[in-house]
Amino acid sequence: MTFQTPDSSHEHIAFIGGGNMASAIIGGLLKRGLPAGQIQVIEPFSEQRARLAQQFQVEVSEAPGASLNRAAMVVWAVKPQTFRDAAEQSRAHVGHALHLSVAAGIRSDTIAGWLGTERVVRAMPNTPALIGQGMSALFARPAATAADRQAVERVVQTMGAYLWLDQEAQLDAVTALSGSGPAYVFYFIEAMIQAGTEMGLSREQAHKLAVGTFVGASALAQEATEPPEVLRARVTSKGGTTYAALTSMEQSGIKAQFIQAMQAARQRASEMGDEFGAS
């Protein structure tokens, strides 16, 4: 694996934050051949540091320091509310590096200001990244070179699929759609399981049927050339069982409520940029 950053003679990568998303990326990088000795993690919690060291055999530290000078890339896998403090502690050591943020809400101009560099890329992944099946959207500031983008892609592809955005504001919509999206799917799976048990199935049976249906339908939607509304129409015969269910949903305004809920998520993503990025 080669990061190909123009001002670095090595492939060292540092993670600020060692939670689930960082662990998913680290695991993917190791599987793709990046030596553990070229990865370091800054993680304030001792339990997390012990887990990371044992699981991945990577270098772990409690706080940022001069060791960050080695990093060709720094991945910011911190909570939005702790980003600023972490950035201020690290700034003196990471000005030369390419920066990839997976923190929700914090805008790239804010990150660039905190770090004193314009080589910043934002990513919005989602939790299926934990098993390499995630969907991420990326936005790069103009100072990020083509080589920087390629380096980011090599990291992000360890989490699953990705796409690039032309406008950073679109990341708020991405957060509402795919970033929070897995929770919506789990919510509907919960409802299907509950309905199944209320109709006489065991919980195990309902769980297997509900999850299997989402997996199969998602695979079909991904492979099909037709849009989802066509696929839905094909299995909806007027007067049939599917028709009865969808008619009930439409009469209850479920689609409109769902869209409204996603708008609320987008609005909250925008607010987080103001709230946690305020000077």
Regions found by a protein language model. Give the residues of each.
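Short pre-catalytic strand/loop immediately N-terminal to key active-site residues, enriched for Gly-Thr
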Residues: 120, 170-176, 228-233
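NAD(P)+-binding Rossmann beta1-loop-alpha1 motif at the extreme N-terminus of oxidoreductases
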Residues: 1-63, 114, 197-198
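Short acidic capping loops at alpha-helix termini that bridge into adjacent secondary structure
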Residues: 36-39, 96-97, 119, 204
